[in-house]
């Protein structure tokens, strides 16, 4: 809000949360104190990279066609997450995913809520996304009161009716300032830092590209004015967040919701931050809002992001295929950064062997090599 005056909201990255908890702590056996130390060092490195314009150079090196593809991919990704959260799409061991049971209340209300939200958007109702969430939630409460929606805590079906209004937020004392550099070798520590660094760097750049493209922030050369401030804020948040006890803080993809509803300045990010603080007090109410109630907003925002697909040049396969791979892999790999990996590598290879190597710039080639090494070395 203050460094760059953009509507980009910062929060702990969900994918990085999973990597932090399941890969670093559960699988590799390191303590969360060590993982926080790695996040802290990663943040320091990001501050340095932002100060010397390395992250900005990477952002500017991404081809214009791929920037549009990132926006589309994020839209598909957001919509898929929304459908998955509501159970519209479920895991299937045979086909990976399949359609959920549309006769269940969460799935039915998610689909009904999506139609309601779209009607509100079409009729240009201000705050249509928020209104759609509230209407879907209220419909869920009605279903619970009518006995159609049955609470079963053991099965993960929770009450939609708040049991209180305000509660004191929990203390951060047990986790704040608990960084530790002991219990891990220097080599392993560097590997952990690099893993956090890679995912955070390209998740952040992907989000900035996608949301900026949708908002129309990019100039004629595909560059984002004042990007240095946005990247510095992101890096500083990661560093401070680690000290306070949270995993990597990043520019999160749901920023697209604010942009889709008209947000164009830092006031949007500032308002979101203030509301996050207020939400700490009203957790008894907010925690009862079910995931199926937020599905309509995510699906509609996804639709708005996908609109950029019409601007992608698919006639030239050296441009069209990398854009296609960016979109596809972002969704099927459940990762913004992995979408960029396959998009950039295919872009460089097709330009190189397709007789258009003069269209490559050194930075994108270096990025492609690093991406390739990342795939090989894991």
Give the role of each language-model region.
Residues 1-9, 119-124, 195-203, 234-244, ...:
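Transmembrane alpha-helix interface/packing and boundary motifs in multi-pass membrane proteins
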Residues 2, 13-22, 26-74, 211-308:
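Helix-loop-helix junctions within the multi-pass membrane cores of secondary transporters/permeases
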Residues 15-29, 257, 270-378:
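Transmembrane alpha-helical segments and their short flanking loops
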Residues 22-35, 57-69, 76-119, 145-181:
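Inter-helical loop and helix-membrane interface segments of multi-pass membrane transporters/permeases
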Residues 40, 44, 48, 111-119, ...:
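Generic alpha-helical transmembrane segments of integral inner-membrane proteins
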Residues 98-99, 133-228, 369-373:
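Helix-loop-helix hairpins and the membrane-proximal interhelical loops
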Residues 115-171, 197-201, 329-341, 350-363, ...:
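Flexible hinge motifs at transmembrane-helix junctions and intramembrane kinks/re-entrant loops
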């Amino acid at each position: 809000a203050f460094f760059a005056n953009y509507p980009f909201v910062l929060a702990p990255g969900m994918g990085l949360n999973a990597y932090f908890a399941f890969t670093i702590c559960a699988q590799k056996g390191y303590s969360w104190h060590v993982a926080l130390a790695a996040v802290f060092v990663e943040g320091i490195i990001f501050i340095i990279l932002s100060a010397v314009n390395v992250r900005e150079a990477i952002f500017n090196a991404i081809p214009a066609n791929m920037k549009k593809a990132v926006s589309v991919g994020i839209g598909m990704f957001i919509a898929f997450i929304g459908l998955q959260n509501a159970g519209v799409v479920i895991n299937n061991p045979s086909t990976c995913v399949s359609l959920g049971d549309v006769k269940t209340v969460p799935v039915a209300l998610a689909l009904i809520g999506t139609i309601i939200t779209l009607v509100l958007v079409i009729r240009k109702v201000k705050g249509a996304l928020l209104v759609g969430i509230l209407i879907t939630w209220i419909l869920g409460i009605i279903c619970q009161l009518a006995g159609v929606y049955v609470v079963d805590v053991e099965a993960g079906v929770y009450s939609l009716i708040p049991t209180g209004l305000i509660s004191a937020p929990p203390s951060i004392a047990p986790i704040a300032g608990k960084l530790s550099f002991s219990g891990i070798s220097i080599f392993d520590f560097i590997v952990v830092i690099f893993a956090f660094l890679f995912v955070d760097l390209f998740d952040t750049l992907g989000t900035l590209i996608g949301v900026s493209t949708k908002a129309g922030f990019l100039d004629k050369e595909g560059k984002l004015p004042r990007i240095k401030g946005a990247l510095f804020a992101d890096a500083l948040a990661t560093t401070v967040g680690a000290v306070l006890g949270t995993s990597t803080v990043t520019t999160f993809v749901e920023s697209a919701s604010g942009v889709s509803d008209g947000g164009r300045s830092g006031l949007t990010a500032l308002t979101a931050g203030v509301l996050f603080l207020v939400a700490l007090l009203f957790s008894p109410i907010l925690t009862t809002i079910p995931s199926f109630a937020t599905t309509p907003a995510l699906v509609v925002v996804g639709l708005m992001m996908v609109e950029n697909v019409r601007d992608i040049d698919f006639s030239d396969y050296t441009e069209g295929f990398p854009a296609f791979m960016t979109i596809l892999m972002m969704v099927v790999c459940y990762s913004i950064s992995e979408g960029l990996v396959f998009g950039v590598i295919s872009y460089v290879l097709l330009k190189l062997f397709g007789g258009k190597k003069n269209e490559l710039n050194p930075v994108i080639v270096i990025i492609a090599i690093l991406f390739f090494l990342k795939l090989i070395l894991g």
